[in-house]
Amino acid sequence: SLYAPSAVVISKTQGASADAPAQRAVTLRCLPVGGDHPAPEKACAALREAGGDPAALPRYVEDTGRVCTREYRPVTVSVQGVWDGRRIDHAQTFSNSCELEKQTASVYAF
């Protein structure tokens, strides 16, 4: 292939620790698009737009005007694998699942 591989495992955990057992995890492959992520095309496009940096996703997500409550029910997500030939090991905690979806769009929507 002419392109460097991009394949990651994305997981979601209730709570503020990435060390807790994942409640759900999916695989995502880009070029060719696949894995068991429910919307791989959208997730690959979002990561591509963010330069493969999951921490940068909020800067690229379209503001839908969605309003979230201030409820604190932390959700921690992680992305591990290879993006465009570079190793990724990212974890981030959001104050609740609404904030997670609002700030990251389709990548963690599973």
Swiss-Prot record:
Classification via Gene3D superfamilies: Subtilisin inhibitor-like (3.30.350.10)
Pfam families recorded: SSI (PF00720)
Covalent S-S links between cysteines: 30-44, 68-98
Record localization: Secreted
GO MF terms, alphabetically ordered: serine-type endopeptidase inhibitor activity
Keyword Cytoplasm carried by entry: no
Subunit annotation: Homodimer.
Family that this chain belongs to: Belongs to the protease inhibitor I16 (SSI) family.
Protein name (Swiss-Prot/TrEMBL): Subtilisin inhibitor-like protein 1
